[in-house]
Amino acid sequence: MPSKNLQQAVLTNEFTTNFITTCKDWLDVNGLAKGNLEKKRDDNEEEERLKTESKLPGHDIHGFDNEIKSLQHFLLDQKVRREFKSLVIVGEYGVGKTALCQKIFNDEAVKSVYAPRVWVSMENKESKEGLDGKICVLKKILKGLGVEELILETISTDAKQEFKDNEEVASNQEAGEIDRETEKEKELSALLYALHLNLRWKKYLIVFDDVRENDNWDEKLDAKLKEDEKWGKYLSDGFPKGSGGRVIYTTRDENLAKNLVAQKHEIHRLWPLSDHQSVWKIYDAVVKDKQKESPRNDKKCIDELMNKSRGLPLAARLLAERDPVFVDDEVGPVGSTHGQTDSSNRQPANQASS
């Protein structure tokens, strides 16, 4: 008859094997496996984007203490309190960019210093061709500042009318005097002017979450107007300088990040978590929140969770959505299958882009 130690070793091995299989299945289902993420980057495929909000994520954030302190310093540094500053947070899907920004956006010290604060989810189902993308984002900011839809419609109508009037009188003007601005350019200029007025003399904080190349939001906001250029042509015209305004972007695109800021130190790269315990805490918190019993947290399981999630907080949370895997000598929740997980119960989790 096998010894008790041998039986326990066999059970532990079965548990670890089941845990590994569970992890792999969930990563494949939710597109978080390393190969799937690399394919997304290679194919540049545009999966459906979800709208994000400024409210706290609803769960504790583990492993980002240094990143939180860095963002607090960026926003609360008194030495540059009147300068306009921008920062880009770059990282892969599921690494926690959105959750990190939600955390700092709702920080009490930040809230006491910045007003207004505007959260802009770059998710948008409208046209983004030409200037449409920029116009759509500007309207989102203005709505976040309390500007009514009627005023935005009036701006659009006035721009169309001005363009039409210019076309009618163009034939009576000399070539050098013709206003060659398009209808969209006039609307963009008017929206930038409205934004400038709403932000002037204010210490504002604006977060642009999940910026992508096809959004056409790809200009440096700290650029200064040149003497020979007309005001209202560039996005930077809408963001007043000298009152301590701050802008934070999140993106997965390293090349786009370089177009959004002037200096390399203004790009903050967010890497997957390297702390095994932080990843386990994320996983365990979801399991407990679902009122399930946590699987054993021995070193093998923690290491396997780290290996399969690759340190991505979203992957750890998704893995926890499954029924925990139990070995025969552990007591699982009522209705659970000891030592295995029924694949027929697999339910996709609600994912929040980050």
From Swiss-Prot:
Coiled coil located at which positions? 33-53
What start and end residues bound the annotated signal peptide? none
Show the GO MF annotations: ADP binding; ATP binding
Identify the residues that the record assigns to the NB-ARC domain, covering every copy: 45-122
Q: Where is the composition biased (Polar residues)?
A: 337-354
- One Gene Ontology term from the biological process aspect of the record: defense response
| Spans annotated as Disordered | 328-354
Keywords (A to Z) from UniProt = ATP-binding, Coiled coil, Nucleotide-binding, Plant defense
Detail which positions bind ATP: G91, E92, Y93, G94, V95, G96, K97, T98
SUPFAM superfamilies in UniProt: P-loop containing nucleoside triphosphate hydrolases
The UniProt function text for this chain reads:
Possible disease resistance protein.
PANTHER family the record matches: DISEASE RESISTANCE PROTEIN RGA4 (PTHR36766:SF70), PLANT BROAD-SPECTRUM MILDEW RESISTANCE PROTEIN RPW8 (PTHR36766)
Q: What is this protein called?
A: Probable disease resistance protein At5g45490
Source organism of the structure: Arabidopsis thaliana
